[in-house]
């Protein structure tokens, strides 16, 4: 499946499936492949700050320190592929950027490979805002598990809505992962 996805990478690629199917790992592999090939200048990692317990603002530390625990699966994948030292060098040089979804409004993400992980926890408004951040020379991979939505019951998942509304859009690919 990885070869098929990598060789047919679209502007927007959605990877949807249950936990443990490799969505996050493949997204990072695709991002690093594009970076190493010189097709993008940077990798931007984001996800919604939604959880069952404390809110992001109540965690100690600066913004980057607060968002880091949410992005651990992405860092784990990078560490596995490149080693921790090289991963940290890319972060320190700004080639890999942590960007909280809440602060994306107004940005244009050009020449970047953008990974939105855990997208099932975006609202409709967050997803539409995110999808419109794409700038020249960029690609987005959006991953999520629609069986693990942690939004309040009154909110609909932006991932579910986006895939339903955009499934026939040119330049968008939708991959469904399963446990097999």
Short names for language-model regions:
Residues 2, 11-116, 120-180:
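Conserved helicase motor core of SF1/SF2 NTP-dependent helicases
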């Amino acid at each position: 499946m990885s070869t098929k996805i990598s060789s047919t990478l679209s502007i927007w690629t959605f990877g949807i499936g249950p936990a443990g199917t490799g969505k996050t790992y493949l997204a990072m592999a695709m991002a690093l492949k594009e970076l190493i090939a010189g097709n993008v200048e940077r990798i931007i990692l984001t996800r919604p700050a939604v959880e069952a317990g404390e809110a992001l603002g109540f965690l100690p530390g600066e913004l980057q320190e607060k968002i880091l625990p949410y992005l651990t699966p992405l860092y784990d994948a990078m560490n596995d592929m490149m080693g921790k030292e090289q991963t940290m060098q890319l972060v320190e040089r700004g080639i890999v950027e942590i960007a909280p979804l809440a602060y994306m409004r107004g940005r244009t993400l050009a020449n970047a490979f953008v990974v939105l992980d855990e997208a099932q926890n975006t609202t409709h408004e967050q997803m539409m805002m995110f999808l419109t951040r794409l700038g020249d020379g960029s690609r987005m991979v959006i991953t999520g598990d629609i069986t693990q939505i942690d939004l309040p019951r009154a909110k609909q998942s932006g991932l579910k809505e986006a895939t339903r509304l955009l499934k026939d859009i040119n330049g968008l690919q939708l991959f469904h992962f399963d446990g097999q």
